[in-house]
């Protein structure tokens, strides 16, 4: 039997070994690594809210009034007025009757999907969906059918060819694909879900707060807010806090309360997180939030244009997630290492997160990045790309 040491050695040999980097200080556009300041270009803190004064003040007030922990799971004694207030705010924001908060995006997807689908049901999932969606589908024991990325014609054929005698059909997709930065074809998915009497679930972890005129996400941007059956999103990316949610009809939310194991068997989110999340929604839904979205969009356009002008492949990105194609794992990690030496912190993405041969730098932009920040990053990426023969 292969030992742990042997497996770890093999990962190192293949350039696939992973380790954690200590980031000192707060999650702003610049961070301190190994005692020196670097430009942070790999955080999901898209609007810069993780260090926003309004969120910090809300969290402090909540701790002073409610304490640090929630004490129990939601179905025991762990439901506070802060939970109910946040869920009401999320439902209003997403235009649904009800909402439910979970402890993480992973817990939300595994809990929702394994509750909604089971034996006798069929789950149709985009090939590039997040790992938590895949794990939720596997946990459900439903039939799991994956279709090629954004290929609506193949999905239609699979829906036609897959018999479901008495069970549910669930179509589930990322709204924004986390490693490529492109968008799901939500209008076409809505048409299919209607035609085949399926449920549609959208994981909008990377769209909520960022996309759409009101920051309500990819479904708002595509004009299908009311047509999505289950809106899933996270509180720890553009919203700057922690946790996740499902927004749906009262019937579906009641069902999740009774069937979603990751919800039932977890101590509930603490007061500080709930209050900060509530403040984040208020900010996103204000003129200040609109200004942040405009700044992020402008930064995205400038950054992509700068990279594309010198020959980098940004892999069809349509959002603030900008992949820079490199190819091999070893070369990608060398690229990341050299960038850090130049004061730019960008993580290399390798298998199993992305398919072999498609390794890339995953650059993520923030509304708070300045033009000088972006120019610094473009200059460093260009110089190292030329050195390594990527461009």
Swiss-Prot record:
Looking at the record's lineage, which domain of life comes first? Bacteria
Provide the positions where the record notes the PTM N6-(pyridoxal phosphate)lysine: 237
* Residues holding pyridoxal 5'-phosphate: 105-106, 178, 206, 234
Q: Which UniProt keywords apply?
A: Biotin biosynthesis, Pyridoxal phosphate, Transferase
Which Pfam families does the annotation name?
A: Aminotran_1_2
Reactions it catalyzes: 6-carboxyhexanoyl-[ACP] + L-alanine + H(+) = (8S)-8-amino-7-oxononanoate + holo-[ACP] + CO2
Needed co-factor(s): pyridoxal 5'-phosphate
Instruction: Give the matching HAMAP family.
Output: BioF_aminotrans_2 (MF_01693)
The reply to whether Transferase figures as a keyword in the UniProt entry is yes
Role according to the record: Catalyzes the decarboxylative condensation of pimeloyl-[acyl-carrier protein] and L-alanine to produce 8-amino-7-oxononanoate (AON), [acyl-carrier protein], and carbon dioxide.
Keyword Transferase belongs to the record: yes
Protein name per Swiss-Prot or TrEMBL: 8-amino-7-oxononanoate synthase
State the oligomer form and interacting partners: Homodimer.
Q: In which pathway does it act?
A: Cofactor biosynthesis; biotin biosynthesis
Disulfide bridge positions per record: none
């Amino acid at each position: 039997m292969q030992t742990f040491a042997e497996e770890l050695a093999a990962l190192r040999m293949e350039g696939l070994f992973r380790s954690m980097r200590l980031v000192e200080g707060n999650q702003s556009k610049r961070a301190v690594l190994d005692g020196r300041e670097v430009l942070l270009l790999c955080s999901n803190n898209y609007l810069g809210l993780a260090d926003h004064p309004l969120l910090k003040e809300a969290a402090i007030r909540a701790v002073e009034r409610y304490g640090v922990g929630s004490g129990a799971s939601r179905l025991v004694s762990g439901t506070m007025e802060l939970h109910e207030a946040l869920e009401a705010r999320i439902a209003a924001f997403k235009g649904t009757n009800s909402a439910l908060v979970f402890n993480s995006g992973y817990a939300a997807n595994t809990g929702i999907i394994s509750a909604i689908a089971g034996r006798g049901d069929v789950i149709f999932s985009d090939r590039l969906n997040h790992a938590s969606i895949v794990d939720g589908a596997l946990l459900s024991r439903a039939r799991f059918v994956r279709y090629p990325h954004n290929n609506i014609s193949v999905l239609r054929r699979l829906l036609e060819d897959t018999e479901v005698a008495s069970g549910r059909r669930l179509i589930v997709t990322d709204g924004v694909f986390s490693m490529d930065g492109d968008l799901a074809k939500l209008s076409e998915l809505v048409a299919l879900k209607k035609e085949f009497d399926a449920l549609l679930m959208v994981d909008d972890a990377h769209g909520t707060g960022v996309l759409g005129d009101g920051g309500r996400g990819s479904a708002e941007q595509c004009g299908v807010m009311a047509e999505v059956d289950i809106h899933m999103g996270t509180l720890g990316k553009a919203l700057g806090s922690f946790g996740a949610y499902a927004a749906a009809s009262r019937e579906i939310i009641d069902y999740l309360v009774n069937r979603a194991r990751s919800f039932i068997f977890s101590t509930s989110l603490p007061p500080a997180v709930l209050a900060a999340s509530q403040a984040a929604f208020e900010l996103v839904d204000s003129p200040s939030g609109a200004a942040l979205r405009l700044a992020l969009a402008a930064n995205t356009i400038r950054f992509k244009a700068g990279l594309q002008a010198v020959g980098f492949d940004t892999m069809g990105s349509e959002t603030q997630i900008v992949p820079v194609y490199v190819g091999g794992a070893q070369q990608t990690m060398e690229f990341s290492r050299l960038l850090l030496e130049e004061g730019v912190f960008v993580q290399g993405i390798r298998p199993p997160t992305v398919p072999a041969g498609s390794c890339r730098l995953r650059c993520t932009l923030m509304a708070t990045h300045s033009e000088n920040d972006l120019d610094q990053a473009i200059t460093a990426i260009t110089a190292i790309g030329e050195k390594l023969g990527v461009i």
